Curated annotation (Swiss-Prot):
GO CC list: nucleus
Function field: Transcriptional regulator. Recognizes and binds to the DNA sequence 5'-GCGGGGGCG-3' (GSG). Activates the transcription of target genes whose products are required for mitogenesis and differentiation.
GO biological process, one term: regulation of transcription by RNA polymerase II
Gene behind this protein: EGR4
Pro residues composition-biased segments: 337-349
UniProt GO molecular function: DNA-binding transcription factor activity, RNA polymerase II-specific; RNA polymerase II cis-regulatory region sequence-specific DNA binding; zinc ion binding
Chain positions covered by the region annotation Disordered: 274-357
SMART domains the UniProt entry points to: ZnF_C2H2
Family the UniProt entry places it in: Belongs to the EGR C2H2-type zinc-finger protein family.
Taxonomy of the source species: Eukaryota, Metazoa, Chordata, Craniata, Vertebrata
Protein name as annotated: Early growth response protein 4
Originating organism: Bos taurus (Bovine)
Amino acid sequence: MLHLSEFSGPDALLVKSTEGCCSEPSTDLTRLPARDPPAATGYPAGDFLSWALSSCGAGEYLTDSCLLEGPAPTPPPGLGYSGSFFIQAVPEHPHDPEALFNLMSGILGLTPFPGAEAAASRSPLDASFPAGSDALLPGPPDLFSPDPGAAAFPEAFWEASPSAGAPSQCLYEPHLSAPDVKPGLRAPPASPALDTASAFKGPYSPWELLSAGAPGSCGSQGGYQAAPEARFPTTGAKIEDLLSISCPAELPGGPASRLYTMGTYDAFPLAPGDLGEGAESLPGLLTPPSGEGGSSGEGGEFLDGTQPELSPLGLRSATADLPKPLVADIPGSSAVPEPPVPPPAPFPPAKARRKGRRGGKCSARCFCPRPHAKAFACPVESCVRSFARSDELNRHLRIHTGHKPFQCRICLRNFSRSDHLTTHVRTHTGEKPFACDVCGRRFARSDEKKRHSKVHLKQKARAEERLKGLGFYSLGLSFAAL
C-alpha cells in the first residue's frame, strides 16, 4: 500500500510544460539555486501539483522549467487526492518500477516512463548521465535513504553534465559489460517527475554512486578527475612495485627465504672479495643459514674456514664438492692412488715492453728501420733483394727501369748513380784522390785502391814463407832488411 503523502519532500516536483514553451530550447541552462523552497501554505500535504503550477505562474522558483511566453496563466483550482491503492505483484517481477511509474503517470498526468526498448537502446556508458534537455534540473531525493545529504545529486556533477545531443566531455568513461550492469543501476528518467527506482532500491542506487563530492565525476572545467582508486598508477609507482618484487630490500639468511633449493647453485660459490663493492649490502648471501652446518656468525669467517683453492676467475671447480672415488674401489685397477692433480697455473703476467739501450724516442709501433733489418724489399718478382733504407731501394729500382738521370757534361754520358758520374768526371780531369799506403800509388776510385792493397798483402805473405825456409824468421829479421 502506498500513500501520496509519502512523496512529500524538501524539493518540489517539477512539471514539464508542453504548451507555450520556447521553440528553441536553450542548451546552457542555469542550475536552480540549491535552497529549500518555502513551505506551500494553503495546500494539502499531497497536493504538490497545484503548488508547482502556482509557483510557475508566480515565477518564483520554477522559471527555468516553465519558460512561458506572455502573461502567466491563472492557477487552476486546487486538485487534491487522498486514498490508497494496492498493486498486486507478479511472482516473476515483484515491485516492477516501470509499472508503478506508468500508473502514477496516468493518475498525475506526467510524462510516462520510457519503455524497455528505449532503456535497452542506451549504452551502459550513458547510465551515469540523464537523457533529455531537462537533465540539468535537480531530481527528487531518495525517499528511503538513511542519509538525505548523500542521496542528493552532487552540484559539481550536474554543472558539468553534457547537454542533450552533445557527446560526453569526460576524458575517461569506464566500460561496463552487460553482466557488470547491476539490476538496480538505471539512468535518471527523462521527466523530472518521481523516480520510482529510488523508491524500490536495488543492490546499488545511482544516488549512492554519485555521492556528493565524489572525485570521479566531471569537474566544472569539463575535465575528468578520476577517483584515487580508479586513476592509472604513475610511472614511479610502477617502477617501485617492480623493484619491490624483483629486488627485495633485505635477503635474510633463513632457510625459508632462499630463492632456490639447497644444493642447486652451491657448486659455484663466490669469495667475499669477488663480489666487489656491493658485498656489504648482501649479508644474507655471505652468511650461511642457521642449522645448515658451520657457525652462523660472520660470513667471512665461515667462508675462510670452508673455502677451497680458487681459480683466477674466482670460481670453484664443479668437481671440488663431489667426492672423488678411490682407485681401489674401481674393479680391475691397482691400489696405487693417482697423483694429485696440480692446481691450474695462473695466467702469466703480461711482458713489459722492452726499451732500447738508449731509451730511444721511437715507440714500439714506430716504422723506423731497425739495425740489420731490411724492411724495404724490391717489388720486382724476379729480384729478391731488400734494403734498409728507402733511398737505397729507389737507387736499386733504376737498374730495373734503366733510368739514368745523371749526365756527364764533358762527354754527355748518362749514369744511373751520382757516384758513378763523379768517378767518371775524374777520368777527364785526371784527379786521383786515393793513394796506396805501401807504395804510394794514386787512384781515382776508392775501390781501385782496395784492389791494389790486396796485391801488397799477397806479397807479404809470400816473403814470410820464404824467410821461414831460410831460418831467419826466428832471429827477428824483418822482410825489409833482406
